[in-house]
Amino acid sequence: MSIVAQKITYIHPDNQVLFKGIDLTINKGQKVALVGNNGSGKSTFLRILAGTLQAQEGEIIYPTPPYYVPQHFGQYDNLTVAQALRIDGKLEALRAITEGDASLSNFNTLADDWTIEERSLAALHAWGLEHILLSQPMRTLSGGEKTKVFLSGIEIHQPSILLLDEPTNHLDRRSREKLYDFITSCRITLLVVSHDRTLLNLLSSIAELSVGEITLYGGNYDFYKEQKEQEQASMQEKLEAKEKELRRVRKTAREVAERKQKHESRGEKQSVRKGIPRIMMGGLKENAEKSASKLKEVHEDKMENLANELKQMRSSLPDLQGMKLDFSASGLHEGKILVTAKEINFGYAEAGDLWPSPMSFQIKSGERWLIQGDNGSGKTTLLKLITGQLPPRSGSLIRADFSSIYIDQEYSIVRNDRTVYEQAQAFNERHFQEHEIKTLLNRFLFPHDTWKKSCGKLSGGEKMRLAFCCLMISNQTPDLFILDEPTNNLDIQSIEIITSMIRAYRGTILLISHDAYFIRELGIHQIITTFAGRLKTNL
């Protein structure tokens, strides 16, 4: 079944236009990704297609309603699992019939779906949710469990059109791989909003939502990335040509002004020598001034137009090269032992051991480590053990003296009650001058009009850039960089920025992430798998 969206316009309640008159057609069986920077309207557009949000203008055409897996679940917290899956009516009808209520309305509601309860429980079981009841409130579930509840609904409802909004955000590695297998093998029409580049490479087309319009690219993410790099290279050439033209026009304008000044001075002297009547001389001067004024106006208009074109081109081609972690090298020599763990395990009070078997490992300076495992398997607990925030229940853990910086998925070092400039100043331990702070903010794509913006209103990508800008301002070169799911709330461009910055870092890295693409690009050396309590090496 196909999806046709025609002339869709959405305007925020504050009358700000998000997008106007956009079109998208997805053919039967086509698997398409919808990508774009944070704030471009991807999730809003998906909600309009799903019918959970009303557009101001436009038309959506599809033969059967799509099944929608949302990104955020707050609106479902007061519902049961059955209600969130929209099967509560059938379950109530089935229960009423089995208890002797043979009314026609119950049979119509059930629609011969006599196995609805068994099918639903089997679908939940397939996603590892056998411990969850259909009558259980959604608010009692974790983010990963809520996602898997909605993913189980695909098997229950068997839709011909499927809409997924950031489906891997809360999933661990095993659940992601299950979703990847489904996407690869399914034959339904699919539209996915995601920053998971492994998932995006499984799709056949990329639809980019940018500046209020959708551009369709044939091929998966890697092909799309190549196309975008070519477009940006071409845009860079045009930008440089425009800059060159603007310099030429400014030079010409200066030369014209200088010639005019010289001509006027020479003309006055000659008129005095030749005895030209004052009235005639005034007329000649007036004509010359009109001509010069017109020429000046032409040059000024041209310069203004070129300057506006350059401003638009620069905004569509941000300077990502300026965002680098210019930390000095860590003071530790490569290969120094930072942490030695021997047969460690952890547990709270009367609870048993967290891991099935104790763990032993050794972290040396310059290495890049990944901690992986299922949700709830103790990855963050292990981080706290390594950094000395928690003691092990058993075994020994020896830590050398080293400095570390912790970056979580919320970028919590950025305080929501500060403005962008206040946040930067809070890390100004080197006593930079005001203009130096603002120069660094500009380097990290925070221009003048963002300095008074509340940090609470920043997107995930903006918080990431500001967090790393603050680290640059403080120049606290860490011996160990700890990254806890750093890509979870970022758009693709922001992920590529943080990848570039972390790759350039020359110290030790300890990473928790389920993003296989990100892990591969960082060049991980060692892996600790917490769910099995064992150490693996060589990714």
PLM feature spans:
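Pre-Walker A (P-loop) beta-loop-beta motif of ABC nucleotide-binding domains
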Residues: 22-33, 188, 359-370, 402
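Catalytic Walker B motif of ABC-type/P-loop ATPase nucleotide-binding domains
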Residues: 162-166, 171, 407, 480-485
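ABC ATPase nucleotide-binding domain signature region
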Residues: 31, 44-106, 365-368, 373-374, ...
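Conserved beta-strand
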Residues: 5-8, 17-27, 58, 341-347, ...
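ABC-family P-loop ATPase nucleotide-binding domains
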Residues: 75-140, 409-470, 474-479
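Coupling and communication elements adjacent to P-loop NTPase active sites across diverse families
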Residues: 1-11, 90-143, 147, 227-350
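H-loop (His-switch) and adjacent beta-strand-loop-beta switch element
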Residues: 202-218, 522-537
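GG-anchored amphipathic helix commonly corresponding to the ABC/SMC/Rad50 NBD signature/C-loop
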Residues: 144-163, 462-482
